[in-house]
């Protein structure tokens, strides 16, 4: 039917006084994310999250993707155009995106003048701490190591807020099940990008770099898994979180649905020992 969808840009929002109607009560908002591996055709989708919630049986699956394939997909990202072009050109898309964010969008998003160099430093710090629960103070210290000028946490917070408005950064909040437990919930967010290719591009990394540093690759791989799980979670009326308490009990991702059901998921790159640990 006509007028079912209104498609808009996402990087720079209009000024409040230019908005005629907020859309409340008239529009339903859909967050458009980078493509999941299922949407881009690299995942076979044989295991359904919806079926797992319904306790339906499933068979153990194997994936034909090699580790070289996965490092490439991590660096390529889920950008639609990148899925349609040659591999060499596809890897450039994330680098072009990061350049545009730090040199243009970071200032256009709300009209506040910001330093492209500091924006780069923040993205690099986030990439070094990807998929980890690090406080703002740690990110600030990491940035200060490469920034000779003064830098307070308020400034770091301002840049992070701007990057969240631009849909570049999307941290994973802590899940509190509200159970009667004496263990205190650790509330520090897990640091994530909306797409892992933003992190690899920020550090100037390619697929071979990840192959040569499998430990770092594991963190970027988790970032990619979180990207995909967020897509699937929203389709199930759910939201993704992480869990960690004062006793050391932790879980990489918690998919909590509006009906109260939830799933706990641990992310491992592969290998029997790591899978058994998970």
Model features per residue range: what roles?
Residues 1, 271-278:
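Short, intrinsically disordered, charge-balanced linker/junction segments flanking boundaries
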Residues 10, 16-132:
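Interdomain motor-coupling "hinge/lid" segment immediately C-terminal to the ATP-binding subdomain
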Residues 263-272:
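Active-site ExK catalytic segment of metal-dependent nucleases
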């Amino acid at each position: 039917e006509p007028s079912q969808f209104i498609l808009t840009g996402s990087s720079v929002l209009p000024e409040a006084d230019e908005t005629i109607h907020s859309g409340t009560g008239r529009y339903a908002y859909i967050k458009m994310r980078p493509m999941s591996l299922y949407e881009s055709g690299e995942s076979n989708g044989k295991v359904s999250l919806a079926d797992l919630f319904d306790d339906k049986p499933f068979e153990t699956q194997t994936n034909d993707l090699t580790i070289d394939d996965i490092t490439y997909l991590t660096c390529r990202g889920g950008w639609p155009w990148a899925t349609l072009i040659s591999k060499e050109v596809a890897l450039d898309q994330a680098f072009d995106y990061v350049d545009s964010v730090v040199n243009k969008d970071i200032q256009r998003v709300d009209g506040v003048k910001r330093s492209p160099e500091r924006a780069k430093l923040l993205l690099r710090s986030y990439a070094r701490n990807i998929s980890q629960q690090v406080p703002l103070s740690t990110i600030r210290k990491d940035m200060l190591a490469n920034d000779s000028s003064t830098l307070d946490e308020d400034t770091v917070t301002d840049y992070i807020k701007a990057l969240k408005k631009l849909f570049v950064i999307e941290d994973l909040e802590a899940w509190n099940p509200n159970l009667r437990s004496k263990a205190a919930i650790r509330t520090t967010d897990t640091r994530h990008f909306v797409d892992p290719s933003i992190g690899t591009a920020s550090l100037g990394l390619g697929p071979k770099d990840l192959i040569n540093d499998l430990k770092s690759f594991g963190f970027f791989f988790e970032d990619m898994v979180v990207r995909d799980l967020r897509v699937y979670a929203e389709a199930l009326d759910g939201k993704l979180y992480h869990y960690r308490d004062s006793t050391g009990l932790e879980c990489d991702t918690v998919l909590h649905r509006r009906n109260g059901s939830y799933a706990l998921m641990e992310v491992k790159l592969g290998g029997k020992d790591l899978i058994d640990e998970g």
